[in-house]
């Protein structure tokens, strides 16, 4: 993210705010987890593959939270068969209009107000053997996990850039007052220019 807390410009441009060393680190984190999870907005915006390509390691299960089944079926996550994908959609959402690859499973879970109960998501992932989950993005999804107190560790890459305005790394208030806001212990590690 930028020094002023943005993960994208207002027009959505985000490639690349941080440097190559941070991208390498992201791939290492993917290689260390059982599953990598993103929200539908990240897939729609970035058409990401969420695979391990910049280091050695196994590809994790790719998980997409998509209450409205809005991710296009031509997305890389569904057409790239190098890793398994779990597409979590709302229980009342539409089924995809075309068949998906053998690497894609669809799990329908109930939604309330367009949101999944994260404890149900985590339980479903645990049933599939997921013990180490990397919540990679985007801002809305990470904010939900933070608010629910479901993050053990948070990696934030701060790039030496000011954007002035743009999409914030968190999408909702994390407390009713400053006293309620999370104040985690912090460690700082330089990664190239970030």
Regions found by a protein language model. Name each.
Residues 1-194:
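Enzymes that bind and transform nitrogen-containing heteroaromatic metabolites
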